[in-house]
UniProtKB/Swiss-Prot annotation:
Pfam families attached to this UniProt entry: DMRL_synthase
MF term (GO), any: 6,7-dimethyl-8-ribityllumazine synthase activity
Top-level taxon of origin: Bacteria
Reactions that this protein is recorded to catalyse: (2S)-2-hydroxy-3-oxobutyl phosphate + 5-amino-6-(D-ribitylamino)uracil = 6,7-dimethyl-8-(1-D-ribityl)lumazine + phosphate + 2 H2O + H(+)
Active site: H74
Name this polypeptide is given: 6,7-dimethyl-8-ribityllumazine synthase
NCBIfam families on file: lumazine-synth
Gene: ribH
Amino acid sequence: MARFLIVEARFYDHLNDMLVAGARAALEAEGHEAEVLTVPGALEVPGAIAMAAENGEFDGFVAIGVVIRGETYHFEIVAGESARGILALTMDGIAIGNGILTTENEEQALERADPARKDKGGEAAKAAIALLKLQDRFGA
């Protein structure tokens, strides 16, 4: 059994609830424990994971959030930089599943967040589990 921290950027409550539920269900189905930490936005997710990874309390992480395109360039910055930050941490050997949705509209986000549909929260948790298994295999 491993301990996972689900780090959520809580902005769209109803969508986050679904993503977290999917992630938690996927982790618990494999016998893992999950705790949830909320941060203000998607740009804060990588930093929160980096801080939490420092103490070794958690074996893996699931990043959760929803970024919906608006009328400004802000979408590109938030979507790209949050993904870049998560990827950088993953390249440093931290097991992270990225479940931060980047969509054109709320309808697309709902389709992806709903555990009964595309279940991207569950998929992100499964990715984190897979990376944790790779850590074990390669002794990372």
